[in-house]
Design a protein with these regions (language model features):
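Conserved, mostly hydrophobic/aromatic
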Residues: 25, 172, 296, 342, ...
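Aromatic-lined carbohydrate-binding/catalytic grooves of carbohydrate-active enzymes
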Residues: 333-470, 483
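Polysaccharide-binding surfaces and accessory modules of carbohydrate-active proteins
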Residues: 12, 17-28, 37-271, 287, ...
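C-terminal beta-sandwich/jelly-roll accessory domains of carbohydrate-active enzymes
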Residues: 678-738
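Glycine-rich, aromatic-flanked loop segments that form ligand/cofactor-binding clefts
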Residues: 77-122, 250-264, 307-332, 369-376, ...
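Active-site neighborhood of glycoside hydrolase catalytic domains
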Residues: 400-402, 436, 440-597, 609, ...
Length: 738
């Protein structure tokens, strides 16, 4: 490898020891010092390639040990240096990135710089999703090889650069070249030490039916940590966080985002150290994790997507929307127009037959809806949620025939047809469980936990995945199914495989996720024209890993339009609006009992993939006309909402309305939506900012036909001259005047 080498976005200098990764608007710099410690120097606004190691201030901190190479220099300590790969047990007492237990029982991981390689394409991760190259943009990759000081263990650090999107990715691979086995007890996707700023962390917490509530707290010396040990990314915390400077807002301030491309246990943490440096980390959660690596075996972390914005949260979100939409989402529906669907779940729950389903479909077709989705209850002896999971055979008595017959009737109406599955689960009251009780996770000698009265299938087993693949593909092919909703309705515990060696039990949570990814990959390969929508009790697995397989995910089981404002607001910080499964449902709402105007429910659902969750035969004629108008609006604004730039116009502070805006990429039009969330006496007017219009173009506002320059709208905003009652909404369009 030459000492001086560069590809456009990756700059290497100083005899191959200084690495500067350049995107359109940001820079990331590392330096391998004379002791071969890889130091993190900078991540922020775009700079040149000058060596910034002079930013590091070394002093004797006291009780901070010194590596032997430092000699008498007490100022040089791993406990105080800003590192890229902090290891355990060798003098850095902050949270480490990697922990290894060696054959002699010791814990030590001291990795030093060895070499580097540059690739003119993005990197892949075996068995896991990752950003991929397209014809429009290829990533570039820097691979830094680190060797452990006292053992034959190699660590490869992967840095991917997507220049146009201002994205840098991180991942790592551990290779055991030694003669003895090791136990890998922790290995994160990245660690980064940020030297001098004060940060706040924005993270997204919640619970089932109330996911991704945005919260913001300062990063202090007490660690800020979120994560999941539920076997999924979970409803409770999302694997995406933001570090921003104090006071940063939508249009100002420095922001660093981190989004994990993974659907299992994870951790994300930030903490100030004794020098007020902030250590920022993300990866697989170390709880219940232990990977046994024999000689020649390797372990790969999931990918973390990093992005920087120097101009606030809006730009950061738009960068994530673009990278996920273009380099994570795949398949036939990556850009193809998604059908407007109706799902029967809230209309019927388990109480349906062919006649009921056809009546719902007939009315939906008359109103312009394009696909019917048959939810839970069509298979096995599934009359409630206590039985039948795993028996993926059509209940022909309930359905009055085969699924192919029902699908043909739906297709003859000119509609597409979709089905619900929950492949990863099994009911004890099922033929599958009676035949294969060992296929379920259960610890010998213990009664397993039940959730929704179901158990979790051992997705690490090839025979389990083969059975599921055969059942799913057979049904999809036989009935010419157009869409599948893939659900997962419980957390994972009692993890024990009846075929894995006991020494490998610490690998099962991760191997479970790999098994799910493997099944999804093979299923989509067998059904390449299928639209797959992810779901886990709504938004319990709403993450970039799942979006690699399902370009839209049911955002929440909560369909209440007012609650959805918060859920969809939090989702928008990282995930494209095109990934948000959002439906109009009945009122009073089944989750909250709230009554919300039909128009408002439609306006909120338009900020997503859009559909209905009701029996349209039971709504009024006036509401049916509203359905027609909403369907027409979805077609009218589809490209704008699914491909345009998204702006949050209201923020984390409490207000009596919520507003958001879509702007076409060519800035020719914009759609602004306002929902009144609270009513008061002597009502004050609603005034909102407008964003993203071209400064020197003229735009006509649909409210009053007023024409103003884009810069005027952007700065002066918009005042409603009509009073919105509680929960009422309005759509406002801005159109370029040519």
């Amino acid at each position: 490898m030459p000492q001086e080498e560069e590809i456009m976005a990756i700059k290497v200098s100083e005899n191959g020891r200084l690495f500067t990764l350049q995107t359109k608007d940001s820079s990331y710099q590392m330096f391998a010092d004379d002791k071969n410690v890889l130091l993190h120097l900078y991540y922020g606004e775009k700079i040149g390639e000058e060596n910034l190691s002079g930013l590091i201030f070394c002093t004797d901190m006291g009780f901070a040990g010194n590596p032997e190479e430092a000699g008498p220099n007490r100022k040089y300590s791993l406990d105080a240096l800003p590192q890229e790969i902090p290891g355990s047990g060798v003098g850095d007492f902050r949270d480490d990135m990697i922990e290894i237990r060696h054959a002699d029982g010791s814990f030590a991981a001291d990795f030093r710089f060895d070499s580097f390689e540059i690739l003119d394409h993005s990197y892949a991760i075996p068995g896991m999703p990752a950003l991929y190259d397209t014809e429009e943009e290829k990533g570039e990759t820097l691979v830094i090889t680190m060797t452990e000081k006292a053992s034959d263990i190699v660590l490869k650090l992967f840095y991917g650069v997507f220049e146009k999107e201002n994205v840098i990715t991180r991942a790592a691979r551990l290779e055991n070249h030694g003669e003895t086995a090791i136990e890998l007890e922790k290995m994160l996707s990245f660690s980064m030490d940020l030297m001098y700023e004060n940060y706040e962390m924005i993270y997204f917490s919640g619970r089932h039916a109330m996911e991704r509530t945005a919260e913001r707290i300062p990063v202090q010396h007490a660690k800020v940590e979120i994560g999941s040990t539920r076997g999924t990314s979970s409803h409770h915390y999302n694997p995406a966080v933001i570090l921003c400077e104090e006071g940063a807002g939508e249009t100002h301030g420095s922001c660093i985002g981190a989004c994990l491309v993974y659907s299992g246990n994870f951790v994300a943490a930030a903490q100030k150290d004794q020098k007020n440096q902030t250590r920022f980390q993300m990866g697989i959660h170390p709880t219940n994790f232990c990977f046994h690596l024999e000689k020649g075996e390797t372990f790969d972390t999931p990918q973390a997507i990093l992005s920087y914005s120097g101009t606030g949260l809006t730009k950061l979100s738009q960068q994530y929307h673009e990278i996920i939409r273009e380099h994570i989402c795949r398949g036939a529906y990556k850009h193809a127009k998604r059908p407007i669907l109706i799902n029967n779940w809230e209309a019927t729950y388990f109480n349906f037959n062919e006649e009921k389903i056809l009546k719902i479909a007939e009315q939906a077709q008359k109103l312009g809806i394009e696909m019917l989705v048959l939810d839970d209850g069509w298979f096995g002896k599934r009359e409630d949620d206590n039985s039948g999971l795993g028996d993926w055979f059509v209940n022909e008595k309930k359905m009055n025939g085969s699924m192919a017959q029902l699908a043909e009737k739906i297709h003859k109406m000119g509609m597409k047809f979709g089905l619900w599955f929950e492949p990863e689960m099994i009911s004890e009251d099922s033929d599958l469980y009676r035949a294969h009780p060992d296929w379920a996770f259960a610890i010998p000698g213990r009664v397993p936990n039940h959730s929704r009265n179901q158990l979790v299938l051992d997705m690490t087993r090839e025979d389990v995945r083969e059975y599921l693949l055969e059942r799913l593909t057979t049904i999809v092919h036989d009935a010419k199914i157009d869409y599948v909703k893939w659900d997962m309705n419980r957390s994972v515990c009692d993890v024990y495989s009846h075929v894995a060696a006991q020494s490998r039990n610490g690998e099962l949570y991760h191997r479970y996720v790999l098994g799910v990814y493997d099944l999804m990959e093979r299923f989509l390969a067998a059904c390449p024209n299928l639209l797959l929508e992810g779901c886990s009790g709504g938004g319990g697995r709403y993450d970039a890993g799942m979006m690699y397989y399902s370009p839209q995910i049911w955002c929440s089981d909560n369909t209440d339009a007012i609650n959805r404002l918060s859920i969809q607001y939090g989702s928008s910080f990282f995930y494209p609006i095109s990934t948000v499964g959002s439906h109009v449902s009945v009122c009073p709402n089944h989750q909250t009992g709230r009554v919300t105007p039909f128009r408002t429910r439609g306006d909120v659902a338009l900020a997503g993939s859009f559909g209905y969750e009701m029996d349209l035969n039971k709504i009024s004629e006036e509401e049916k006309e509203m359905v027609k108008e909403q369907v027409a609006a979805m077609h009218e604004y589809y490209e704008l909402t699914h491909e345009g730039l998204y702006y949050r116009l209201t923020g984390l502070k409490k207000q009596d309305f919520m507003a958001w805006e879509f702007v076409a990429k060519d800035q020719s039009r914009a759609l602004l939506t306002i929902v009144k969330t609270d009513a008061e006496g002597n009502m004050l007017p609603v005034h909102t900012k407008v964003c993203g219009l071209a400064e020197d173009k003229l735009y006509r506002c649909s409210l009053d036909q007023e024409v103003r320059l884009g810069r005027t709208w952007n700065r002066a905003g918009l005042t409603l001259h009509q009073v919105l009652g509680e929960y009422e909404s309005i759509r406002v369009e801005f159109t370029e005047v040519k």
